[in-house]
Protein backbone atom coordinates (compact mmCIF):
# COMPACT_ATOMS: atom_id res chain seq x y z
CA UNK A 1 0.00 0.00 0.00
CA UNK A 2 1.03 3.63 -0.36
CA UNK A 3 1.00 3.95 3.42
CA UNK A 4 3.32 0.96 3.92
CA UNK A 5 5.72 2.10 1.19
CA UNK A 6 6.08 5.62 2.60
CA UNK A 7 6.14 4.46 6.21
CA UNK A 8 8.99 2.05 5.44
CA UNK A 9 11.05 4.95 4.07
CA UNK A 10 10.82 6.66 7.47
CA UNK A 11 12.83 3.85 9.02
CA UNK A 12 15.41 3.20 6.31
CA UNK A 13 18.81 4.87 6.67
CA UNK A 14 18.70 7.98 4.51
CA UNK A 15 15.10 7.21 3.58
CA UNK A 16 13.02 10.19 2.52
CA UNK A 17 9.32 9.56 2.99
CA UNK A 18 6.74 11.71 1.28
CA UNK A 19 4.89 12.56 4.49
CA UNK A 20 2.03 14.29 2.67
CA UNK A 21 1.42 11.10 0.70
CA UNK A 22 1.85 9.01 3.86
CA UNK A 23 -0.60 11.05 5.93
CA UNK A 24 -3.19 11.42 3.18
CA UNK A 25 -3.16 7.67 2.59
CA UNK A 26 -3.62 7.22 6.34
CA UNK A 27 -6.74 9.41 6.33
CA UNK A 28 -8.03 7.52 3.27
CA UNK A 29 -7.47 4.21 5.08
CA UNK A 30 -9.73 5.39 7.91
CA UNK A 31 -12.34 6.58 5.42
CA UNK A 32 -12.33 3.43 3.27
CA UNK A 33 -12.03 0.90 6.09
CA UNK A 34 -14.89 2.57 7.97
CA UNK A 35 -17.04 2.54 4.83
CA UNK A 36 -16.16 -1.10 4.21
CA UNK A 37 -17.24 -1.94 7.77
CA UNK A 38 -20.51 -0.02 7.34
CA UNK A 39 -21.31 -1.93 4.15
CA UNK A 40 -20.48 -5.26 5.80
CA UNK A 41 -22.58 -4.42 8.89
CA UNK A 42 -25.52 -3.53 6.63
CA UNK A 43 -25.21 -6.96 4.98
CA UNK A 44 -25.20 -8.62 8.41
CA UNK A 45 -28.30 -6.62 9.42
CA UNK A 46 -30.12 -7.60 6.22
CA UNK A 47 -29.24 -11.27 6.68
CA UNK A 48 -27.10 -11.40 3.55
CA UNK A 49 -24.12 -12.28 5.79
CA UNK A 50 -24.35 -14.33 8.99
CA UNK A 51 -21.56 -12.44 10.75
CA UNK A 52 -18.96 -9.83 9.85
CA UNK A 53 -15.80 -11.26 8.34
CA UNK A 54 -13.62 -8.17 8.06
CA UNK A 55 -14.38 -6.03 11.12
CA UNK A 56 -11.70 -7.54 13.38
CA UNK A 57 -8.98 -7.27 10.74
CA UNK A 58 -9.96 -3.72 9.72
CA UNK A 59 -10.08 -2.59 13.35
CA UNK A 60 -6.70 -4.16 14.18
CA UNK A 61 -5.05 -2.57 11.15
CA UNK A 62 -6.45 0.90 11.90
CA UNK A 63 -5.67 0.60 15.62
CA UNK A 64 -2.05 -0.15 14.69
CA UNK A 65 -1.65 2.91 12.44
CA UNK A 66 -3.86 5.26 14.50
CA UNK A 67 -0.95 6.78 16.50
CA UNK A 68 0.46 8.13 13.21
CA UNK A 69 -2.56 10.45 13.08
CA UNK A 70 -1.00 12.46 15.90
CA UNK A 71 2.19 12.91 13.87
CA UNK A 72 0.13 13.90 10.84
CA UNK A 73 -1.84 16.41 12.88
CA UNK A 74 1.26 17.86 14.51
CA UNK A 75 3.07 18.28 11.20
CA UNK A 76 0.03 19.98 9.66
CA UNK A 77 -0.51 22.21 12.70
CA UNK A 78 3.14 23.28 12.81
CA UNK A 79 2.97 24.09 9.08
CA UNK A 80 -0.08 26.28 9.70
CA UNK A 81 -2.40 23.90 7.85
CA UNK A 82 -5.12 23.91 10.50
CA UNK A 83 -7.72 22.22 8.29
CA UNK A 84 -5.52 19.15 7.87
CA UNK A 85 -4.51 19.28 11.53
CA UNK A 86 -8.18 19.23 12.50
CA UNK A 87 -8.84 16.35 10.09
CA UNK A 88 -6.05 14.16 11.49
CA UNK A 89 -6.56 15.02 15.16
CA UNK A 90 -10.31 14.61 14.66
CA UNK A 91 -9.91 11.13 13.18
CA UNK A 92 -7.83 10.17 16.22
CA UNK A 93 -10.31 11.58 18.74
CA UNK A 94 -13.40 10.23 16.94
CA UNK A 95 -12.07 6.65 16.76
CA UNK A 96 -13.30 5.48 20.20
CA UNK A 97 -16.89 6.31 19.15
CA UNK A 98 -16.56 4.49 15.81
CA UNK A 99 -18.47 1.16 15.99
CA UNK A 100 -15.60 -0.44 14.07
CA UNK A 101 -13.50 -0.23 17.26
CA UNK A 102 -16.17 -1.68 19.58
CA UNK A 103 -13.89 -4.61 20.52
CA UNK A 104 -10.60 -2.67 20.49
CA UNK A 105 -9.91 -1.87 24.15
CA UNK A 106 -6.69 -0.04 23.28
CA UNK A 107 -8.72 2.46 21.24
CA UNK A 108 -11.78 2.64 23.50
CA UNK A 109 -9.70 3.19 26.67
CA UNK A 110 -7.02 5.40 25.14
CA UNK A 111 -5.92 7.91 27.78
CA UNK A 112 -4.34 10.18 25.15
CA UNK A 113 -7.70 10.98 23.54
CA UNK A 114 -8.40 14.07 25.73
CA UNK A 115 -4.89 15.43 25.04
CA UNK A 116 -5.29 15.03 21.28
CA UNK A 117 -8.78 16.54 21.56
CA UNK A 118 -7.07 19.69 22.90
CA UNK A 119 -5.00 19.89 19.74
CA UNK A 120 -8.10 19.37 17.60
CA UNK A 121 -9.82 22.19 19.51
CA UNK A 122 -6.83 24.50 18.98
CA UNK A 123 -6.82 23.75 15.24
CA UNK A 124 -10.59 24.30 15.08
CA UNK A 125 -10.18 27.57 16.99
CA UNK A 126 -7.60 28.76 14.44
CA UNK A 127 -10.16 28.00 11.72
CA UNK A 128 -12.95 29.77 13.67
CA UNK A 129 -14.91 26.51 13.43
CA UNK A 130 -16.98 26.88 16.59
CA UNK A 131 -18.88 23.61 16.14
CA UNK A 132 -15.60 21.67 16.01
CA UNK A 133 -14.18 23.72 18.91
CA UNK A 134 -17.17 22.77 21.04
CA UNK A 135 -17.06 19.11 19.93
CA UNK A 136 -13.37 18.57 20.68
CA UNK A 137 -12.85 21.02 23.55
CA UNK A 138 -15.65 19.31 25.46
CA UNK A 139 -13.48 16.17 25.41
CA UNK A 140 -10.17 18.00 25.73
CA UNK A 141 -11.10 19.96 28.85
CA UNK A 142 -10.94 16.68 30.78
CA UNK A 143 -7.14 16.45 30.35
CA UNK A 144 -5.49 17.30 33.67
CA UNK A 145 -2.47 19.28 32.41
CA UNK A 146 -3.65 20.64 29.06
CA UNK A 147 -7.40 20.93 29.61
CA UNK A 148 -7.14 24.68 30.21
CA UNK A 149 -6.42 25.13 26.49
CA UNK A 150 -9.79 23.62 25.61
CA UNK A 151 -11.50 25.75 28.25
CA UNK A 152 -9.96 28.86 26.66
CA UNK A 153 -11.20 27.78 23.23
CA UNK A 154 -14.66 27.08 24.65
CA UNK A 155 -14.74 30.48 26.33
CA UNK A 156 -13.85 32.12 23.03
CA UNK A 157 -16.44 30.10 21.09
CA UNK A 158 -19.22 30.76 23.58
CA UNK A 159 -18.09 34.34 24.10
CA UNK A 160 -18.88 35.14 20.48
CA UNK A 161 -22.55 34.86 21.38
CA UNK A 162 -23.27 32.02 18.97
CA UNK A 163 -24.27 29.73 21.81
CA UNK A 164 -25.90 31.68 24.61
CA UNK A 165 -26.02 28.68 26.98
CA UNK A 166 -22.55 28.86 28.54
CA UNK A 167 -23.66 26.64 31.41
CA UNK A 168 -22.95 23.62 29.17
CA UNK A 169 -19.26 23.78 29.90
Segments predicted by a language model, with ranges:
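Short loop/turn segments at strand-loop or loop-helix junctions that form parts
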Residues: 1-2, 153
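TPR/Sel1-like alpha-solenoid repeat signature
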Residues: 76, 117-124, 136, 151-158
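A broadly tuned preference for mixed-charge, low-complexity surface segments
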Residues: 133-139
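Short coil/linker segments at helix-helix boundaries
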Residues: 2-119, 131, 160-169
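Solenoid-like repeat scaffolds
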Residues: 140-144
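Short helix-capping/linker turns of helical repeat alpha-solenoids
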Residues: 112, 146-148
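Short connector loops at secondary-structure junctions
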Residues: 108, 149-152
Amino acid sequence: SIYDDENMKLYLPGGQADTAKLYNSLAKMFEYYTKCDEVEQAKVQSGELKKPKLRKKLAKTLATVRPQLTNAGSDAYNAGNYANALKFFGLYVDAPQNPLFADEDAVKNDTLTPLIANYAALAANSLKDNAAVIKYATIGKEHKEEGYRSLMCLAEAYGKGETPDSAKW
